[in-house]
Curated annotation (Swiss-Prot):
The gene is efp. One of its GO terms (cellular component) is cytoplasm. One of its GO terms (biological process) is peptide biosynthetic process. Involved in peptide bond synthesis. Alleviates ribosome stalling that occurs when 3 or more consecutive Pro residues or the sequence PPG is present in a protein, possibly by augmenting the peptidyl transferase activity of the ribosome. Modification of Lys-34 is required for alleviation. The modification N6-(3,6-diaminohexanoyl)-5-hydroxylysine is found at residue 34. This is Elongation factor P. Belongs to the elongation factor P family.
Length: 189
């Protein structure tokens, strides 16, 4: 297993902290006028999602986290588990709701997501950056509504609610940015 020194820390690096896989979100090298230099990092625990700040003396090391990001296809939800499959090997994984978190509202069957595996167990699911979903319910638009005139809430086929321009109607397909949960544009069928 690889070991990273403090001078090798960078954003996005996956390391083990307190026996849990973590991802470095922010890394800052600090050299005070008096005393030893140190590195301050902000890390996200990949299992719990909690973000904490830690300080390491210059020369400290952390082991690498044995995590793998695998592209998987979302198959179905059986009520308590969401099922994903690796397209190449047809290997299937079941993911619970607490691991899926907010990603569940953007998943449509057959979508390809990135699933983070640790010890061959899924610990995080990242939906595609943009998804195309149908609007199942929204207020009717009136003649003369334009894109600059504000917005209205719309319920999508997955149950997610996003703000859309006034001219968008029920039944239309729209493109949504899953990172922000915002309407991007209309989509062609």
């Amino acid at each position: 297993m690889a070991v990273y020194s403090t001078n090798e820390f960078k954003n996005g690096l996956k390391v083990m902290v307190d026996d849990a896989p973590c991802s470095i979100l922010d890394c800052e090298f600090v050299k005070p006028g008096k005393g030893q230099a140190f590195t301050r990092i902000k890390i996200r625990n990949l299992k719990t999602g909690r973000v904490v700040e830690r300080t390491f003396k210059s020369g400290d090391t952390l082991p690498s986290a044995d995590v793998a990001d695998v592209e998987m296809q979302y198959l179905y939800n059986d009520g308590e588990h969401w099922h994903f499959m690796v397209p190449d090997t047809f290997e299937q994984y079941a993911v619970t709701e607490n691991i899926l978190a907010d990603a569940a509202q953007w998943l449509k069957e057959q979508d390809v997501c990135v699933v983070t595996l640790w010890n061959n167990e899924p610990i995080q699911v990242t939906p595609p950056n943009f998804v195309i979903l149908a609007i199942t319910e929204t207020d009717p638009g009136l003649k003369g509504d334009t894109s600059g005139g504000g917005g209205k809430p719309a319920t999508l086929e997955t149950g997610a609610v996003v703000r859309v321009p006034l001219f968008v109607q029920t039944g239309e397909l729209i493109k949504v940015d899953t990172r922000k949960g915002e309407y991007v544009s209309r989509a062609k069928e």
